[in-house]
Regions:
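A penicillin-recognizing enzyme superfamily signal
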Residues: 78, 289, 293-296, 300-302, ...
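Non-catalytic, structured segments within soluble enzyme domains
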Residues: 22, 27, 111-366, 532, ...
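Active-site SXXK
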Residues: 82-83, 229, 299, 359, ...
Length: 850
């Protein structure tokens, strides 16, 4: 009895000592423990998703792939699979399972190694949310105390739901929703028992047991899960026997991107990061953009095709690499495919290796091990590249171009395969809605994998003749008209700084003598533009350009401005052309229409300032767009008067008046009216002539009329000195687009080519806006305007139509006449007298015309 007594006393002392030690340990660790109450408001890290305007996924950003699901959305069999495998006594313990610990310890003692884990689901949750992955005794102790606290705070179902959404399951998949998508391309409710068991087996070692890494290990682990489910009575013997014999059909499933718009998606990502920091990638934001699949894909296709066409006509630069030389032992297929898999793809261009070649045909292997045939049709274009201005002879047989062992690039053209090469030239396209500035399409380069530099928004390039419509607008705002006569004869002026004569020339160097301003713009006459610049003044012209949104620091105050020496981005150019297309309003380009949080709540919605060409004052108001909504004294108080429209109004004054009126009325906010609507119509009409010309002369953009087969379009070519940059910018109903092409290396020019006869409809001669940039503009605009009814140019109030003499710009007095538009009060009043000849003085200098 005495022994029993002492034993009981010792036991009680041990228990008290143990309890005291545990309490002391708890008191020591408690200040270091995180507040588990935050679990009530825990936010799952959900990636940012970017959508098109019509709701299609175009990009996803975030390190963790997660698709949150509620417990009732998860099949019961899947829940049981996790419980059976990870914590069979989950509904019986209070965060820590002594039975499980004892069982794991016993197995470890008798087997000599730890083959069973003792962590409950609650402990795993505590570790995943609050603790580091380090394997230390202190972390394990903290894990135990946190698990107990969590059990006191949350219900079992809440713990289980949080766990099944937080657990890491390999390949950046967190939670069962993401794992179902990553491995099987399904939602959780579509999974089979086989697939559920595979996923339930992953928490122990996601990198080792996933079926994409090792199918054998995945099968073995799946069978362990099925055995545990059978032991717990969750499945029948028949289900077990059937499922364990099934194959695991797993593949990596990336997020289902409907279509790609990488340059615009990157712009969205940067904007979201600027707004929300790192949480942009974790808080489940859904961003809706302004682009649509049809329009964006048309833009990307137009740019890529045009770049490839330019690249082909300039010749083949040779194979990308030589894997083995002719006469050496060929590589085996595995070595070839491993090498090709390590190479990127660029748009339609795929890496390939030539495995055989004869005069009629070559065979090339792709990265997936398949082979394609390259006939003479697919290599005929590949005359040797010698320089940007010189190409070699057209090849006569396939082996003139291809040899066994070469690593090349190929692309599919219809049913055939063609030799290709990664282009060195690059291009950009920006398309916006001129009425509100919404970006309709944006392409920042040939391929985002090739270069992430966004030429649409970041490349400052000289604009060449693309600047002329803006400068002619300035000239007409100061008194010139579309019928004003300017002398198209050579100019020579001494440049003291350069120590030589400055002699701007037309391209081509052809001169017509006195011509009307409309023809000067339509034929892109450089000397005519210089004369107009001199007539209005360089400083006036440079300052006027700022009305179109062009930054002052990029505008030179010299006569070379007339030839486009200023540098702007394609986005800035498109914005400027929108002013001419929308009646004179400077809209702001924008590309995010709406941002939603992870619950679907709208936290941002775009409210762009819009154009209103029907309104007759610079600052408008109200929903009806009528000037009599307010009393006269209200209009005088906050609006720019009608008389002020035709004078230079500082931009801040326009903005302040606009904001004041909006604050007063709660009205739609309108974009600044930077040029009056009649003037905008005149330059819009002139851009139309740039495409369609007149009897006796052809506009530089004539190909657009041929390609689009509609007359409600207008545009302007642009080519810089030495053809280093080529542009085409213009409008159609509801759309303005600017295209640029050139080399990132500013030292290179676009050169010229000779016709080879090997390329159907090959462009030849000197590269420039009409040949190098316009084909992309034409192709894109044709696709965008397909099915859009023609909308004839309709003169706004304030425009009068007068019959003028073509050769003098005066009132017509017989034949050789055309109808011309004028702002009321600026039309000619004198009859044409042909004997006088010209209104330009003999020394080539422009007369005072106003």
């Amino acid at each position: 009895m005495k022994f029993v007594k002492y034993f009981l006393i010792l036991a009680v002392c041990c228990i008290l000592l143990g309890a005291g030690s545990i309490y002391g340990l708890y008191r020591y660790i408690e200040p270091q423990l995180p507040d588990v109450a935050t679990l009530k408001d825990v936010r799952l890290q959900i990636p940012m998703q970017i959508y098109s305007a019509d709701g299609e996924l175009i990009a996803q950003y975030g390190e963790k792939r997660r698709i949150p699901v509620t417990l009732d959305q998860i099949p019961p069999e899947m829940v049981k699979a996790f419980i059976a495998t990870e914590d069979s006594r989950f509904y019986e313990h209070h965060g820590v399972d002594p039975v499980g610990i004892f069982r794991a310890a016993s197995v470890a003692l008798f087997s000599g190694h730890a083959s069973q884990g003792a962590s409950t689901i609650t402990q795993q949750l505590a570790r995943n949310i609050f603790l580091s992955p380090e394997r230390t005794l202190m972390r394990k102790i903290k894990e135990v105390f946190l698990a107990i606290r969590i059990e006191q705070l949350l219900t079992k179902d809440e713990i289980l739901e949080l766990y099944l959404n937080k657990i890491y399951l390999g390949y950046r998949a967190y939670g069962v929703g993401a794992a179902a998508q990553v491995y099987f391309g399904k939602t959780v409710d579509q999974l089979t028992l086989n697939e559920m068991a595979v996923i339930a087996g992953l928490p122990k070692a996601p990198s080792t047991f996933n079926p994409l890494y090792s199918m054998d290990r995945a099968v073995a682990r799946r069978n362990v899960v099925l055995s545990r489910m059978l032991d717990e009575g969750y499945i029948t013997q028949q289900q077990f026997d059937q499922t364990r014999t099934e194959a695991i059909n797993a593949n990596y499933h990336a997020p289902e991107i409907a279509f790609s718009a990488p340059y615009l998606s990157e712009m969205v990502r940067q904007e979201m990061y600027n707004r929300y920091g790192e949480s942009a990638y974790e808080d489940g934001y859904r961003i809706y953009t302004t682009i649509t699949r049809k329009v964006q894909q048309a833009a990307q296709q137009a740019v890529r095709n045009n770049v490839l066409d330019y690249d082909m006509r300039h010749g083949y630069r040779g194979p990308a690499n030589v894997l083995w030389k002719v006469g050496e032992s060929a590589w085996d297929n595995n070595k070839i495919t491993d090498t090709l898999k390590a190479l990127p793809t660029y748009g339609p261009l795929l890496p390939a290796a030539v495995t055989s070649a004869n005069p009629q045909e070559a065979t090339a292997m792709l990265a997936d091990g398949s082979t394609v045939a390259l006939s003479m049709e697919g290599v005929r274009w590949a005359r040797p590249y010698r320089s940007d201005t010189q190409q070699g002879p057209t090849p006569r047989k396939v082996t003139d171009v291809l040899q066994t062992g070469q690593q090349i690039w190929v692309r599919q053209v219809g049913d055939a395969w063609w030799l290709a090469q990664v282009p060195e030239v690059n291009s950009a396209l920006v398309s916006i809605n001129p009425q509100n500035g919404a970006v309709m399409a944006l392409v920042g380069g040939f391929d985002f994998n090739q270069s992430k530099f966004n030429r649409a928004t970041q490349a400052l390039r000289q604009v060449g003749s693309n600047i002329k419509p803006f400068l002619y607008t300035a000239a007409m705002d100061k008194g010139l008209t579309l019928a004003s006569m300017l002398n198209d004869v050579p100019i020579s002026r001494w440049d003291a700084g350069a120590g030589s004569d400055w002699q701007p020339k037309n391209s081509p160097p052809q001169y017509a003598g006195p011509i009307r301003l409309r023809q000067g713009l339509g034929q892109s006459k450089n000397v005519v533009m210089v004369r107009a610049m001199r007539a209005m003044g360089v400083d006036y012209a440079a300052e006027y350009l700022q009305r179109f949104g062009f930054p002052a620091q990029n505008i030179v105050h010299t006569e070379s401005l007339a030839l486009g020496s200023a540098s702007f981005t394609p986005m800035q150019v498109a914005r400027g052309y929108a002013v001419m297309a929308n009646g004179g309003f400077l809209v702001d380009p924008w590309f995010i229409s709406k941002i939603e949080n992870d619950q679907g709540g709208v936290i941002f919605e775009a409210k762009p300032k819009v154009a209103c060409p029907e309104c007759d004052i610079p600052v408008i108001y109200g929903d009806t767009q009528k000037s009599n909504v307010l009393e006269n004294n209200d209009v005088e108080d906050v609006a720019i008067s009608r008389e002020q429209q035709n004078v230079s109004v500082p931009m801040p004054q326009l903005e302040q008046a606009n904001q004041a009126l909006v604050a007063k009325t709660g009205a739609q906010e309108y974009a600044p009216h930077v040029i009056n609507t009649p003037l905008a119509f005149l330059i819009k009409s002139a851009l139309n002539t740039n495409i369609f010309g007149e009897p006796g002369w052809q506009g530089t953009g004539w190909r657009a009329g041929r390609d689009l087969q509609r007359r409600d379009i207008g545009g302007k070519t642009g080519t810089t000195n030495s053809s280093k940059d080529a542009w085409f910018s213009g409008y159609g109903p509801g759309v303005v687009t600017s295209v640029w092409i050139g080399f990132d290396d500013h030292r290179r020019n676009l050169g010229h080519t000779t016709a080879s006869g090997a390329i159907k409809d090959q462009i030849s001669g000197y590269e420039g806006g009409a040949k190098s940039a316009q084909p992309a503009w034409d192709a894109y605009m044709k696709a965008v305007l397909e099915g859009v009814p023609e909308q004839p140019l309709t003169p706004p109030p304030g425009i009068v139509t007068v019959n003028i003499d073509r050769s003098t710009g005066q009132l017509a007095n017989g034949g050789n006449s055309r109808e011309e538009y004028f702002i009321e009060g600026t039309q000619p009043t004198q009859q044409a007298v042909h004997e006088v000849g010209t209104t330009i003085i003999d020394n080539g200098e422009a007369q005072e015309l106003f």
